[in-house]
Amino acid sequence: MPSLYFGTELKLHKEVKPLILAFISGVESGKIKKNNMTPEEEKRVDRAIEILEESPIYLEREPNYDCMFLENMIEKYVNQYEVGAIMIDYVELTPPMIGEYTRMTRGLQAREDSILLNVSTVLKNLAEEFDVFIKIYTQISDNARRDHTIRDSGAIKGSKSLQVRADLGVVVMRPVERELSMLKPLIDLYGEPNICLNIYKNRDGDLGEFKVWGRINLGNYHFEELFITDWSYRPFREKIEKVYLHSDTKDEFVSELETDTVHIMEDDDLPMFDEETGEIIEEVRKPRGIRRSRS
């Protein structure tokens, strides 16, 4: 799918492009920037460059933007390049936004929450009008960095009105020691996470608030999911649908998955949980499947 990255801070060719090449190749961006790679890594990066050049990925940068700029940019890339996914990194209050809102409201006091709510509304309308996926990033407040219990819209720096129109809201943070101690039974089974995706808003989703724990390599942004919990750090106990395979294809199917990024678990591999608390009451051996990078 043709995609657009719109940035406000990072330099596109010196900072963003190496990150994309790192993700495609699996070679960490620091090595790419310093040209400190092995011959094998150089081959992978060269191939990643070819893939990127052949891919419909477009990059734009503009620190001082307003809603009209976003509307014109999105319309241009949808109509000219058939873009279907747009990433905005990141949304914050800008002087052009303040001026635009003041003119629109004929001098009404331009409060930050009102302006960002307008931005959220405009982006939601553009997503619906052009039938595109729009993902925006914003900054985390200092309070959320200090307090691990703030992992919802209260973690947004500036104003949480920015997420009002969003269908999905996620706060991405490193786990603190207190959280890791509460997760010890799961960590013993699946490994220790260094990142958590706190999904606090999931409109029309089967799950409400939940947390996805995983490991991320910040050098190439490869992410490995480890386990999922509810907002109280208890593992989910969802119904698992069984898939039955013909004996002739089962071994081949399982082998293919286990060399990808999926854990294959037999029934007796699954831990037993307390019905009331969700705590693990019987630990079992680790699953047979081993997660491996696709690269």
Enumerate the language-model features and the residues they cover.
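Structural recognition of the conserved hydrophobic beta-strand(s) that form the central parallel beta-sheet
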Residues: Y5, M87-I88, V132-Q139
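Hydrophobic/aromatic beta-strand patches that form the interior of the parallel beta-sheet core
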Residues: L4-F6, Y58-E60, K135, V170, ...
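Short acidic/His/Gly/Ser-rich catalytic and metal-binding motifs that mark active-site loops
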Residues: K14-V16, T94-E100, N143-D147
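Cytosolic-facing regulatory segments adjacent to core modules
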Residues: P2-E82, V212
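C-terminal regions of RecA-like/P-loop NTPase motor modules
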Residues: G26, K31-I32, C67-E75, N79-V83, ...
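Phosphate-binding/switch loop-helix module in NTP-utilizing enzymes
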Residues: Y58-L126
